[in-house]
Curated annotation (Swiss-Prot):
Cross-referenced SMART domains: ZP
Tissue-specificity statement: In the embryo, expressed in the excretory cell and, during dendrite formation, in the non-neuronal cells surrounding the sensory neurons, including hypodermal cells.
Record-linked PROSITE patterns: ZP_2
Domain ZP: from-to ranges: 35-295
Function: Required for permeability of amphid and phasmid neurons to external dyes, chemotaxis to ammonium chloride, avoidance of high osmotic stimuli, male mating and dauer formation. Along with dex-1, enables neurite growth and maintenance by anchoring amphid dendritic tips during neuron cell body migration in embryonic and larval development.
Listed name of the protein: Protein dyf-7
Domain of life, source organism: Eukaryota
Species classification: Eukaryota, Metazoa, Ecdysozoa, Nematoda, Chromadorea
InterPro entries in alphabetical order: Celegans_DevNeuronal_Protein, ZP-C, ZP-C_dom, ZP_dom
Signal peptide coordinates: 1-24
Gene3D superfamilies in UniProt: Zona pellucida, ZP-C domain (2.60.40.4100)
Length: 446
């Protein structure tokens, strides 16, 4: 009973110490994140850290952050405040002997680490606070990808407080005629094959290490059939009847062309590739791959064409499964190879009509009738409008001419009236023009 009690007390004590240690480590950490690029990494300080906030707000403080042991070297340290009051929370540490930060090669990764120091230069007391924070970067060396159409990253799950950039590697198949991305192809037809890296600030080159055709999603199955066309980082000789040797564009894109085939009667073919990812292009450069220097092919153009070509295609569901204890995932997709007989049957078979299920009358909607003469209706309307326009113009011309002739007939010519002696001009007087003088004058003519 006493032993059980002692064990319980010891377990509670260990749990308390672990919790206290984790809280202390979180409290002591003043680095928010680490941004890893190819030739250096940038340490970003936590702006909400109480000590950092206190030194920034104190006008007399002079906070600095630097690589441990290299305070006097300019590239290895920086001041967080300048004379103008501007603040800086970033420290970029280059790789090399200058700051004694080097990349260490591991079987699956590259590793760089150091320790940064945060202190106040204005504090000259003996017991001033100096804080240390361990930082590191972890770079993936190999990427296992089996997928045709999407970006596949290294999925290794490693507990860390540093940075771990993920390379973007894409594998896809395209038609040799239209250049569209393929999910199915006919047997014995040529298909283009691409492996492309989208270069970023960390990764600038790739190199295929091993690529295999297989009839199984799980390539490690005992009865899986395999055809390896890249092995040991170079194309396998004697595979020209199936696939051409991979060619290299700028150490970032590898492409080839192969003739589709089937494993027996199985129409699904899987492609497995393991790719080495490099921080510099020359690290992945190999002479066994044919280099194409005059090509304008880039990963961005490949991705643009791929996205444009798959908009009308049904996206296949991604299947993933863990492959090792580190938790890395292999993404799987398949290429359907249709035989000549199956292709002929698909062409000859009638198009199946969808079955119409009877629905209640209030929910059933009859489709709008489509007449075969729907295309002639606009022509008929246009002809009628043109005829009406011509008729209106003719009527307007006819009535205009007739009105003009009537005006000429009823008009009065003053010169012809005075020159013709037989014409009598009656003179009328208004009521207001009749006067005594006018009456006497009028009587003379009667």
């Amino acid at each position: 009973m006493n032993q059980l009690w002692r064990a319980s007390c010891l377990q509670v004590l260990i749990t308390f110490l672990l919790i206290h240690q984790n809280k202390a480590s979180e409290k002591d950490r003043f680095v928010e994140l680490v941004d890893c690029i190819a030739d250096s990494f940038t340490v970003v300080l936590n702006k909400s850290d109480p000590e950092v906030m206190r030194m920034i707000s104190n006008p007399k403080s002079q906070p600095v952050v630097y690589v441990y042991g290299h305070k006097t070297r300019h590239p290895c340290g920086t001041s967080m405040k300048d004379e103008k009051g501007l603040t800086n929370f970033n420290l970029t540490i280059p790789y090399g002997s200058e700051c004694d930060v080097t990349l260490t090669d591991l079987p699956k990764h590259r590793y760089a680490e150091t320790t940064v120091v945060l202190e106040d230069n204005a504090d000259l007391s003996f017991g001033k606070t100096t804080r240390l924070n361990h930082v590191f970067c972890l770079y993936t060396r190999n990427v296992k990808t089996i997928r045709f159409s999407d970006v596949s990253n290294g999925h290794e799950v490693i507990a860390s407080t540093g940075g771990k950039p993920k390379p973007k590697v894409e594998m896809l198949f395209r038609s040799t005629d239209s250049g569209k991305t393929l999910q199915a192809a006919r047997e014995n037809e040529f298909v283009e094959f691409f492996i492309a890296l989208s270069p970023d600030s960390a990764y600038h080159g790739i190199s295929p290490k091993e690529c295999t055709f297989s009839d199984r999603e799980d390539i490690s199955a005992p009865d899986a059939k395999k055809i390896t066309f890249v092995q040991g980082g170079c194309p396998v000789n004697g595979m020209n009847d199936i696939i051409d040797p991979l060619a290299n564009v700028n150490d970032q894109i590898y492409f080839s062309k192969f003739r589709t085939f089937r494993f027996g009667n199985q129409s699904t073919v899987f492609v497995h590739c393991q790719v080495q990812v490099c921080l510099k292009k020359d690290e992945c450069s190999k002479t066994c791959y044919k280099k194409v220097s005059d090509s304008n092919l880039t990963a961005e153009r490949l991705r643009f064409r791929h996205k444009r070509s798959i908009t009308d295609l049904e996206r296949r569901t991604t299947r993933s499964a863990p492959t090792d204890d580190n938790g890395s995932l292999d993404l799987t997709n398949s290429l359907t190879v249709v035989s000549r007989i199956e292709s002929a049957e698909l062409v000859a078979s009638p198009i199946s009509q969808p079955t119409i299920v009877d629905t209640p009358s209030e929910q059933r909607r009859d489709p709008c009738p489509k007449s075969s003469n729907m295309g002639f209706i606009p022509l008929i309307i246009m002809g009628s409008l043109a005829s009406l326009l011509l008729f209106s113009a003719g009527a307007a011309i006819y009535f205009g001419c007739k009105l003009k002739s009537m005006k000429k007939k009823d008009s009065f010519d003053m010169m012809s009236a005075f020159s013709n002696p037989t014409v009598s001009m009656p003179v009328t007087y208004s009521h207001y023009q009749r006067s005594a003088y006018n009456a006497s004058v009028d009587s003379l003519y009667r």
